[in-house]
Amino acid sequence: MRPSLQLETIEARLANQTVTTQEIVPGQREAAVALVLQPEVSGLRALFILRAKKEGDPWSGQMALPGGHRETIDADLVETARRETHEEIGLDLNQAGRYLGSLAGIRANPRAGFDLVVTPQVFALEDKAVPLQPNEEVAE
């Protein structure tokens, strides 16, 4: 199966799904991560990062999708995922990516114990020659 057909299938399924949203209660934080898919001849690749080790970071040293907390400047969680991805690895999803849809949010259970709902946002990377520039939060 060609990767473009796989992306089309993923996009169609995301468009046709009913996303169950987590109820956000007062004091609870929201975050978004970007699941970035890149078509290759052999199939799809997904972009992961290795978070830098940092004292006090509940996700320190873990493999992750780029993303982070929703800020007041973010219109929605798609914008959060785009902003955080650009900040963390220099990838501008507004230019190099195509938004495919959202997955259901999940409650995170960080070691720090605070309440957080993380919602994955799915993108297709359409430009294969995009250089990544990790910031200090990313080991690789």
Where do the model's predicted regions map?
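Acidic/proline-rich low-complexity IDRs
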Residues: S4-Q6, R13, A34, G43, ...
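Short N-terminal helix-initiation segments at or just after the protein's N-terminus
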Residues: I10-R13, S60-H69, T85
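Entry/capping segment at the start of metal-dependent catalytic domains
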Residues: M1-V25
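Unchanged
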Residues: E55, H69-E140
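Surface-exposed, interaction-prone regions with an acidic/low-complexity signature
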Residues: R2-L7, L44, F48, W59, ...
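N-terminal strand-loop-strand
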Residues: Q22-L65
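Charged, low-complexity, helix/coiled-coil-prone segments
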Residues: Q17-L35, F123-A139
